Every structure is written in C-alpha cells, then in structure tokens.
C-alpha cells in the first residue's frame, strides 16, 4: 500500500511533484539495530523549528529510503509541507523541480549518487542547499551510497557543502536484528512470525532486507488465502524450497 502526497512548488512553470511513499515505512516500523544514535539525531532534527542537515550513506537495501519515507510521514502528519526527491527516478522530472523547495519544512533527496557527474542536477542541488542555508527554516536530509567526498561529483563546491553537518553511516543489521525486524514487520501487519520460521527464512533466502520483507508479505497473503499458520513446511510449500 502507498500513501500519496502532492507538493506544489513555487516555480515559474508551476511544477508539481507527486510523492508516492510506502505507508508502512515509518519510524515505528524501523528496527534500528546499531543505528540508535543515528535515529535519535534524525528525530531531533525533525523536532527542531530551525533548519538542520543530515547526510546518510549505506549500500542499497540498508534502509536509507525507509528513513526518508519515515521522516516525510512524520512531518506530513503534523501538517507540514515536505518534498521527497528520489534521484534514482530522475528521468521522471527535471532539476527545476527543486526550485522553491526551500519554502518547505522538510526536503529529502534520496540516492544522490545517481546524479554524480550530471552538471545540471549537481548545480540545482548546490543552489537549493544555499537557499536552505539562507532561509534557516528547512530541514534537509540527503542519502547516498558512500560518503560525500567519495561521490565523484563534478562540482567541488557541492562536495564541500555535503560534507558539512551531521554525516552517518547506516550500519547493516546483524542476523539477530534482521529476525527482530521481520517479527516487528509481521506484528505491525497483524500476524506473528514464529522464531523458527524467521530463522529458516534467513538461512534459505537472500538476506537483503527488501527481499525478506517482500517474501514476508507474500507469505502473509498466502497464509490468509490458505487459512493456515506460518510453519516451516508451509513456507517450503509456498516458496518451493
């Protein structure tokens, strides 16, 4: 399921960026593992009335988009205007979509590595960063797959700007934390994931969390359809293991 938010931007072209955000990716559904300090810093920035900047980096699938979705959801529920820009989908829009975003309460730029070397996008992000600094009110969250200085950006001033503020590496979850994350996800969806079934999934499947969550959703649907509890034999049958 997805929630839908439309942000109208103050640009000459009256651009509008529709945001399709998963409604189950909130702070309540995020298992922090060794990322408690990162999570606390992020939530502290969201509570501030003035601007703040955090850069999160991790490999794909570690949960960085989840945290940006959660931040957008939290401020949206408070009635604040937010902007989420997934740069891995940059072909859907143009750099001018960032114009006017300094007037929002929160701007989230996801997967900045996807525009490394793109002069137009790099300049647009740099200009937005400077406008946010001047406004003093907008919170800015940016994610990438590596630290700012390793992004191979063509604009040195942007690399310098990204290196300011708080920079965190999103630590990967241990297997025990992945089990806890799966069980939390199940509880939030209204069912229980037995520990032995969870450990079986971790042993037999790709341990990337996105894959595990998709499999859990598949098993939930199959369990409801078949009116059967989640057991290892049932999981083997559904997943053909």
Curated annotation (Swiss-Prot):
Keyword flag Transferase: no
A Pfam family matched in the record: Bac_DnaA
Keyword Transmembrane recorded: no
Entries under Gene3D superfamilies matching the protein: 1.10.8.60, P-loop containing nucleotide triphosphate hydrolases (3.40.50.300)
Signal peptide, first to last residue: none
Keyword list, A-Z: DNA replication, DNA replication inhibitor
GO biological process, alphabetically ordered: DNA replication; DNA replication initiation; negative regulation of DNA-templated DNA replication initiation
InterPro entries according to UniProt: Chromosome_initiator_DnaA-like, DnaA_dom, Hda, Hda_Enterobact, Hda_lid, P-loop_NTPase
Assembly mode: The active form seems to be an ADP-bound monomer. Forms the RIDA complex (regulatory inactivation of DnaA) of ATP-DnaA, ADP-Hda and the DNA-loaded beta sliding clamp (dnaN).
Family classification: Belongs to the DnaA family. HdA subfamily.
Role played: Mediates the interaction of DNA replication initiator protein DnaA with DNA polymerase subunit beta sliding clamp (dnaN). Stimulates hydrolysis of ATP-DnaA to ADP-DnaA, rendering DnaA inactive for reinitiation, a process called regulatory inhibition of DnaA or RIDA.
PANTHER family referenced in this protein's UniProt entry, alphabetically: CHROMOSOMAL REPLICATION INITIATOR PROTEIN DNAA (PTHR30050), DNAA REGULATORY INACTIVATOR HDA (PTHR30050:SF5)
Protein name: DnaA regulatory inactivator Hda
Organism per entry: Salmonella typhimurium (strain LT2 / SGSC1412 / ATCC 700720)
Name of the gene: hda
């Amino acid at each position: 399921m997805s929630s839908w938010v439309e942000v109208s931007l103050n640009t000459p072209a009256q651009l509008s960026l529709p945001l399709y955000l998963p409604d189950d990716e909130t702070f309540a559904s995020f298992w922090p593992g060794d990322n408690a300090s990162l999570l606390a810093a992020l939530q502290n920035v969201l509570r501030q009335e003035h601007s703040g900047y955090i850069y999160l980096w991790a490999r794909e699938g570690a949960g960085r988009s989840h945290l940006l979705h959660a931040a957008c959801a939290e401020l949206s529920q408070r009635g604040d205007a937010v902007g989420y820009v997934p740069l891995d989908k940059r072909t859907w829009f143009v750099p001018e979509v960032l114009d006017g975003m300094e007037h929002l309460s929160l701007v989230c730029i996801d997967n900045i590595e996807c525009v490394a070397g793109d002069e137009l996008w790099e300049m647009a992000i740099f200009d937005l960063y400077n406008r946010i600094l001047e406004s003093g009110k907008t919170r800015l969250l940016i994610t990438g797959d590596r630290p700012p200085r390793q992004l191979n950006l063509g604009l040195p001033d942007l690399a310098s700007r990204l290196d300011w503020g708080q920079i965190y590496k999103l630590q990967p979850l241990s297997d025990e934390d992945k089990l806890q994350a799966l069980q939390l996800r199940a509880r939030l969806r209204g069912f229980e994931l037995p520990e032995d079934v969870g450990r079986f999934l971790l042993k037999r499947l790709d341990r990337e969390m996105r894959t595990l969550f998709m499999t859990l959703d598949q098993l939930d649907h199959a369990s409801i359809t078949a009116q059967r509890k989640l057991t290892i034999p049932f999981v083997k049958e559904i997943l053909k293991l």
